[in-house]
Amino acid sequence: MDIVDIRSKSNDELRELLVNLGKELVNAVLNRKVDKSTNHFYCRNIKKDIARVLTVLNERRKEEKHV
């Protein structure tokens, strides 16, 4: 997911996306444990997407504090 797409979403959409990414990460980790042939970089990409979403949410929260 691109950072431009993340920044264009509202806070509620980002929180929903964060929940979905968390579920997706759990499923990916479990599938990786069961099936060794899955793409190992997929989990890393999900973690990076989660970090991007959290970064945008924290930036917005800090911005609201200063205003």
UniProtKB/Swiss-Prot annotation:
Keywords, alphabetical: Ribonucleoprotein, Ribosomal protein
PANTHER family per UniProt: 60S RIBOSOMAL PROTEIN L35/50S RIBOSOMAL PROTEIN L29, LARGE RIBOSOMAL SUBUNIT PROTEIN UL29C
Gene3D superfamilies: 1.10.287.310
One term under GO cellular component: cytosolic large ribosomal subunit
Domain of life the protein comes from: Bacteria
Keyword Ribosomal protein: yes
InterPro entries for the chain: Ribosomal_protein_uL29, Ribosomal_uL29, Ribosomal_uL29_sf
Coiled coil: none
MF (Gene Ontology): structural constituent of ribosome
Cited Pfam families: Ribosomal_L29
Keyword Ribosomal protein: yes
Annotated family: Belongs to the universal ribosomal protein uL29 family.
Signal peptide positions on this chain: none
Protein's recorded name: Large ribosomal subunit protein uL29
GO biological process: translation
